Swiss-Prot record:
Its main location: membrane. SUPFAM superfamilies: MFS general substrate transporter. Belongs to the major facilitator superfamily. Keywords: Glycoprotein, Membrane, Transmembrane, Transmembrane helix, Transport. The keyword DNA damage does not apply. It is found in: Membrane. This is MFS-type transporter TwmF. MFS efflux transporter; part of the gene cluster that mediates the biosynthesis of wortmanamides A and B, reduced long-chain polyketides amidated with a specific omega-amino acid, 5-aminopentanoic acid (5PA). GO terms for cellular component: plasma membrane. It comes from Talaromyces wortmannii.
Length: 549
């Protein structure tokens, strides 16, 4: 069997195929996917500003972390299953199901009367969100050749960036003027529009010959069960490590070890005949560059959430910005990812090489995160805005070029499993991108409190042992006298500095790994069993060509 790299070499010696061009249906599908991605992106960040108000209203206490983690957990653990479902039942119905699940979860969150109901709604939302974002990339991969894929990924990235940027802004505005419940109710009309749009235009091929029970037998039930259970165990450990339980406690170590052991067993089963249709075939990770891309996908995803969850802490507890103003102040970290993604996509399409893009992008991220360590009480608007722009531009370049690079090493028939694996790694990185800086932040806060950095014992008790993140708001700080405010702001500032000091190491390692990447030719033709349902002439026939013709 020929490898993708050898296929690329054969293409260079054969006549160039006619340039691929999208038609109306492709654009219509991209618009529909854009609306669904806007939904998912908004919900990823909308609570970064609104969280303190929501948590106080529902009296969640120490369980507040599950409002975020339930979303991450379900969106990550379900990805391999969604990828396999899309191969078995087709992209159309699985995507429509994901949108419906997301809207259902949003309704439950908006109507939540208890913390448990909110957490359950967030878990359901996460299932839909993970499916929406991952399936969008699978569908784009079915419709667009690898060499041109970056352009369409940039479109979705721009929408994700706009949604991520609007999330804190909308969340802050809604909390300040209406009710936090509309943070979730807003998804209902938008979700309805996206469902109708995709129902009309998303008509792509799938295997209609197999019976329902034949399709069910193809599902790797054991593999999916292990992945879900392992992800739950790891996230449970990370949720309470350093807050309810010490990192060295058996309450933390046992679920953490069980989770990683489960993932190790899962990886082993993927190489055996026990998995007739593996979720993540080991052939995806045979090339050294594939392994590097997987590691750097994890790191870049972790660094993104590192910033999204701790920049608001700096803005609200150190700069004393209101939720609405903090939402506006986060615009650079989200919006500057858009031109970064476009530059990365254009470079990928123009030269067909991802290594130079990754080197430059991770260099920018490392520089920007280093500048974040300069954050203090008197940091100017120009400083924090420019520093965010540097990190965001590099992150945008990484996002649009990492998946096409990872897909370059696999055949088109594996596109769904490959994309699901990549997104699983990425969302797994999001989980650690909250857990690692949170542990660093809490540890630094406790150390400073132990040194007597805050003179008022009641304040120290409030923000000790993991309470600092929940209390990170201007309203909390401003209720105290001026001298005590300065002490609180100083403690938060020093903790934030330590958080970003550690992030430099992660970005630096990723930068060094990019130097070891090897470029592989990106395919200019497309062979897929999941092309557009309605065949056209000329170029469209080439797009819909089947791998087994």
């Amino acid at each position: 069997m020929k490898s993708p790299s050898s296929s690329a070499e054969m293409q260079s010696s054969s006549p160039e195929p006619a340039p691929w061009k999208p038609d109306f249906q492709v654009y219509a599908i991209v618009i529909g996917l854009g609306i669904t991605n806007l939904l998912a992106a908004l919900e990823n960040t909308v609570l970064t500003i609104a969280a303190p108000v929501v948590l106080t209203d529902l009296e969640l206490g120490e369980n507040f972390i599950w409002v975020t983690n339930a979303f991450f957990l379900s969106s990550t653990a379900i990805l391999p299953l969604f990828g396999q479902f899309s191969n078995i039942f087709g992209r159309r119905y699985v995507m429509l199901t994901a949108v419906a699940i997301f809207v259902l979860g949003s309704g439950l969150c908006g109507g939540a009367s208890t913390g448990a109901m909110l957490i359950a709604g967030r878990a359901i939302q996460g299932v839909g969100s993970g499916g929406i974002i991952m399936l969008s990339s699978i569908i784009i991969s079915d419709l667009v050749p690898l060499r041109q894929r970056g352009n369409f990924s940039a479109i979705l990235m721009s929408i994700l960036g706009i949604g991520s940027a609007l999330g804190p802004l909308i969340g802050g505005a809604i909390v300040s003027s209406i009710s936090w419940r509309w943070v979730f109710y807003l998804n209902l009309p938008i979700g309805g529009v996206s469902f109708v749009f995709l129902f009309i235009f998303l008509r792509v091929k799938y295997n209609k010959e197999m019976t329902f029970w034949q399709k069910i037998k193809r599902i790797d039930l054991v593999g999916n069960a292990i992945v879900i259970a392992s992800t739950v165990a790891i996230l449970y450990a990370l949720s309470y490590a350093g807050t309810r339980y010490p990192w060295r406690s058996w309450h933390t170590l046992v679920p953490l070890l069980v989770g990683f052991l489960g993932l190790f067993i899962f990886a082993g089963l993927q190489t055996t005949a026990f998995s007739a249709e593996p979720l993540m075939p080991t052939r995806f990770f045979r090339a050294p560059t594939s392994i590097i891309l997987a590691i750097n996908t994890f790191v870049s995803a972790a660094l993104l959430y590192w910033c999204l969850f701790f920049l608001p802490v700096f803005l609200q507890s150190v700069k004393l910005y209101s939720p609405r103003r903090a939402g506006v102040a986060l615009l650079p970290i989200s919006l500057l990812g858009i031109p970064g993604s476009m530059v990365g996509a254009i470079a990928l399409v123009r030269w067909g090489r991802y290594k130079p893009v990754h080197i430059f992008a991770f260099a920018l991220q490392t520089l920007g995160l280093g500048l974040f360590t300069l954050f203090r009480e008197d940091t100017s608007v120009a400083e924090w805005a420019v520093f965010q722009c540097i990190v965001a531009f590099g992150g945008g370049m990484i996002f649009t070029t990492m998946l096409p690079a990872f897909q370059a090493f696999i055949h088109e028939r594996d596109i769904a499993a490959c994309t699901a694996a990549w997104y699983f790694i990425r969302l797994f990185g999001h989980i650690w991108g909250v857990a690692i800086p949170a542990a660093i932040f809490n540890q630094r806060i406790d150390t400073l409190l132990g040194q007597g950095a805050i003179s008022d014992p009641s304040v120290s008790k409030t923000i000790a042992a993991g309470g600092a993140y929940q209390a990170a708001s201007a309203a909390f700080v401003k209720q105290f006298p001026g001298s005590l405010q300065l002490e609180i702001r100083s403690v938060y500032s020093q903790a934030i500095q330590r958080v970003f000091q550690v992030s430099i190491a992660f970005a630096g390692v990723a930068f060094l790994l990019t130097l070891l990447e090897k470029d592989v030719g990106l395919r200019k033709t497309l062979e897929t069993d999941f092309g557009l349902e309605k065949e056209g002439a000329g170029q469209q026939a080439d797009v819909e060509g089947r791998s087994h013709e």
